[in-house]
Amino acid sequence: MPIIINLDSVLEKRGMKSYELAEAINITTANLSILKTGKAKAIRFSTLEAICNVLKCQPGDILEYIDED
């Protein structure tokens, strides 16, 4: 998959655990895990906005495009 989710590195920089983020953005830890592992097929803008708001980051800090060519 050419879209990489760098959520773990941003969480580590902020000193926050996954369960804390899940609680703060009101999603289950299971759904956050699916997102973090790249198994999610999509992400709602409202979820991305909530993540960025809590982590004080930009979407580009979390999402990365890798050209597979």
Give a label for each model feature.
Residues 1-16:
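A short, Lys/Arg-rich alpha-helix, primarily the initiator
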Residues 16-34:
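Short alpha-helical DNA-recognition segment
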Residues 11, 22, 52:
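The alpha-helix within a helix-turn-helix
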Residues 12, 26, 37, 67:
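Residue-level detection of the helix-turn-helix DNA-binding "recognition helix"
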